[in-house]
Amino acid sequence: MPADLNMKVLVVDDMVTMRRIVKNILKQLGFGNVDEAENGQEALQKLRADTFGFVVSDWNMPVMTGIDMLRAIRADEKLKTLPVLMVTAEAQQSNLIEAVQAGVSNYIVKPFTAETMQEKIAKIFK
């Protein structure tokens, strides 16, 4: 099943530049309904208040990390099936294993290309 380009996507990163880059790539890929949050706590508030179809999140953020947000999403009855793509500088195998164990849908290591993001999203929604 291909991704629904009309679904609401949440981009979570404490760096405004990174949020802008990810949003621009998502728009290039056809996703027009993109919101953003600065950390996992803000993201969870938005996810619980609205209906999102997909989350793209950084790992290292203040207040609440992406991995802690992912665990909270998977523990939440309403949100637990929400696809989450982790986009992070954390390239160590132990980080990938931790993310997989926490229930990540897919994982991209920074820096990355639009093509890489497109491939990872396609795998999530196939």
Model-inferred region functions:
Residues 45, 67-80:
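Short amphipathic alpha-helix used as the core "switch/output" element in two-component signaling
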Residues 23, 68, 91-106:
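Alpha4 helix (beta4-alpha4-beta5 surface) of REC/receiver domains from two-component response regulators
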